[in-house]
């Protein structure tokens, strides 16, 4: 009977510990995904600016 109480107690402690570490791991993954999204957004904005400048140069060259 004491073994069952000890087993349940140890299992509870492990579940709490693993639950907290999983949240940290998921948070890090979320931050990485967010950073990738920000870089993609910035690259798109920069690319659109370059394309607009190229279109302006082409329009100026045509007259």
Swiss-Prot record:
It comes from the Eukaryota. Pfam families: Cecropin (PF00272). One of its GO terms (biological process) is defense response to virus. Its main location: secreted. InterPro entries: Cecropin, Cecropin_insect. GO terms for cellular component: extracellular space. It is found in: Secreted. The modification Arginine amide is found at residue 62. Keywords: Amidation, Antibiotic, Antimicrobial, Immunity, Innate immunity, Secreted, Signal. Residues 1-23 form the signal peptide. Cecropins have lytic and antibacterial activity against several Gram-positive and Gram-negative bacteria. PANTHER family: CECROPIN-A1-RELATED. Belongs to the cecropin family. This is Cecropin-C. It comes from Drosophila erecta.
């Amino acid at each position: 009977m004491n073994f069952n109480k000890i087993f349940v107690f140890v299992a509870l402690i492990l579940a709490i510990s693993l639950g907290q570490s999983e949240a940290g791991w998921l948070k890090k993954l979320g931050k990485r995904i967010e950073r990738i999204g920000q870089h993609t957004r910035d690259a798109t904005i920069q690319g659109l600016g370059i394309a607009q400048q190229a279109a302006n140069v082409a329009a100026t060259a045509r007259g």
